[in-house]
Amino acid sequence: MAQDEKTKVKPAVSVRDLTKIFVIGKEKVKALSGVNLDIYENEIVCLLGTSGSGKSTLLNMMAGLEKPAKGSITIFGHRIDKMSERKLVLFRQKYMGFVFQAYNLMPNLNAIENVSMPLAFAGEKRKSREKKAREMLKLCGLGKRMKHKPTQMSGGQQQRVGIARAFVAKPKLVFADEPTGNLDTRTTIEIMEMMVSMARQNHQTLVIVTHDVEIASYADKIYHIIDGTISSVEDNRSKQIAVGSKEAAQIVAAAESV
């Protein structure tokens, strides 16, 4: 989206003067200090920084998982920093999907059951949610792994289940916290191309947290985080990796052959 167009459109996510303080023993540690940012609909954004920079704390606060000491967080016109925990739970169910570094799959559930969980929480009937879960798993290259439990799958396959779960309810906003941190290089590329392709095809906003500049290269915009502040913002559109239908088909085919 061009800069002049953005001035006419309200951001999907707007953060203003965000500050977060943790108390460790008798010491107060400022994890975030006066952070401001705007993320627009359909953008793929990366929060890039080293361990302890504050990037995951910023993501957690935008997801409503932590409360700020100061500042505001507005998502799709709603001030989530003012919401009660109950309202936040309902808001996340309606608008957000999550991809975790550690996958966070239920070990006693198979792939279909894990993927259909967000739909179950939303009250969707079993037949409908399992149909959607199957379709999403096929899209993620797991057509042959639908009945497998997490212990029966590789790390890459588990993360594909995690991605399917994050996208199955078609949330407007997806957060991915170090989504490839436990994966090898080849699987990392496959996972990133799949996740970015799905977000673009479904016109979703994707926010990725990473310490890896290669992962950041998939984003439209990169926020460099240092010591709890945004040190710089990089427009990456001219350099980003584009994923075409041919490449996406190859990724799925490779996954199916495993």
Indicate where each model-derived feature is located:
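ABC-family P-loop ATPase nucleotide-binding domain
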Residues: 1-21, 232-258
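Intrinsically disordered, low-complexity segments enriched in Ser/Pro/Gly/Ala and basic residues
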Residues: 6, 32, 52-55, 230-231, ...
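ABC family nucleotide-binding domain
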Residues: 11-225
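H-loop (His-switch) and adjacent beta-strand-loop-beta switch element
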Residues: 222-235
